[in-house]
Design a protein with these regions (language model features):
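Conserved SGNH/GDSL esterase-like catalytic core that processes O-acyl groups on lipids
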Residues: 5-108, 115-122, 127-139, 229, ...
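A structural motif corresponding to the C-terminal end of an alpha-helix
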Residues: 109-121, 154-166, 207
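Substrate-gating cap/lid alpha-helix
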Residues: 133-169, 263-278
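Non-membrane alpha-helical structural segments and their capping/turn regions in soluble enzymes
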Residues: 93-104, 145, 149, 194, ...
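Flexible glycine/proline-enriched surface loops and loop-helix/loop-strand junctions
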Residues: 138-141, 181-189
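Conserved catalytic region of serine esterases and O-acyltransferases that act on ester linkages
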Residues: 9, 26, 184, 188-306
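Flexible glycine/proline-rich, aromatic-decorated loop/lid segments
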Residues: 172-178
Length: 306
């Protein structure tokens, strides 16, 4: 998929609407950063209209608050990214028919509108995330996931029927939540924490506006040669106890994970990676611009650090 075919395109005026998931994207800037990186030169403009607790049928606002339509027109929105389904899923199986009606009504209400004054707005539907098992705090997590999965499937089918792009966040987050001894994604089962937004933002950005892969660089301590993509080495100097070199990144750096940097194993592919092969046994410290950033054994360096 190239930028011209992607749901979000360089230069677009993007509007997010939806529930707490959308609302909190503004407090966790990973997605916005990724979209701006990938549209550098002709950057997207982002307006977040998400509101905690919003559903397709209920969007309470203070008196005299600007309408959604007036805000979309003021922003000259080219694309609307709609994040719904979590609140609606609490109605269970009996609420699916009404949710389908609401989805179709939402799509119909926007589809022909020219908020940018030139062309019909494009729509993207985004599913809710999975419900995380936090033990005694989330006793109904399996039941909740059955409901969320059903609402996600309905969103997928509805989007396909009307030719609207759909992004499934339920499947990827459900898979991550199966991990053992891995960081939790949420604070209460349904609201993502900072790490959760880091995880989800990359998947959502890849679906909206694909970008380059993180750089990978491998250095052989014995020969001094390097291989990889997305970065290159220069001014390399090697001694029996140390090595020094300059790394030139040929693309935007990947976004480091928050906190202590621990990530799910399957998400390490989203990080820039440096590996050093053929080091003598021992521990080695990486110093970047005079600041220590990582210490690892020769075995860990050979495997690569992100």
């Amino acid at each position: 998929m190239n930028a011209a075919e992607s749901p979000v395109r360089p230069g677009d005026h993007v509007a997010f609407v939806g529930n707490t998931f959308a609302d909190q994207l503004r407090s966790h800037g990973y997605l916005e950063t990724l979209l701006l990186q990938r549209s550098a030169g002709n950057p997207v403009s982002i307006r977040n209209l998400g509101w905690a607790g919003d559903t397709l049928s209920a969007r309470d606002r203070p008196t005299n608050f600007p309408t959604e339509t007036s805000t979309l027109e003021a922003h000259k929105a080219d694309v609307i990214i709609a994040c719904f389904g979590m609140g609606e899923s609490f109605a269970g199986e009996s609420g699916l028919a009404e949710f389908k009606n609401q989805l179709n009504a939402f799509i119909t209400s926007h589809r022909a509108r020219k908020y940018n004054g030139k062309s019909a707005v494009r729509l993207v539907l985004v599913s809710p995330i999975a419900y995380e098992n936090l033990g005694a705090r989330t006793p109904r997590w399996q039941e909740r996931n059955r409901d969320i999965a059903a609402y996600t499937q309905l969103m997928n089918e509805t989007a396909a029927n009307v030719g609207v792009p759909f992004v499934d966040l339920y499947g990827p987050t459900a898979e991550l939540m199966k991990g053992k001894n891995t960081p939790k994604l949420t604070d209460n089962g349904i609201n993502l924490n900072d790490y959760g937004y880091w995880c989800v933002s990359r998947a959502l950005a890849d679906a909206l506006l694909p970008g380059s892969k993180p750089w990978v660089l491998s250095v052989d301590a014995k020969s001094g040669k390097s291989t990889g993509h997305g970065a290159r080495i220069s001014q390399a100097k090697f001694t029996t106890t140390a090595m020094a070199f300059t790394v030139q990144e040929l693309a935007w750096p990947s976004l480091a994970a928050p906190g202590k940097g621990q990530v799910h194993p399957q998400l390490k592919r989203n990080l820039d990676q440096l590996s050093i092969k053929n080091l003598k046994p021992g521990n080695y410290r990486l110093v970047v611009d005079g600041k220590p950033v990582a210490t690892a054994s020769h075995i860990q360096w050979a495997a690569g650090l992100g």
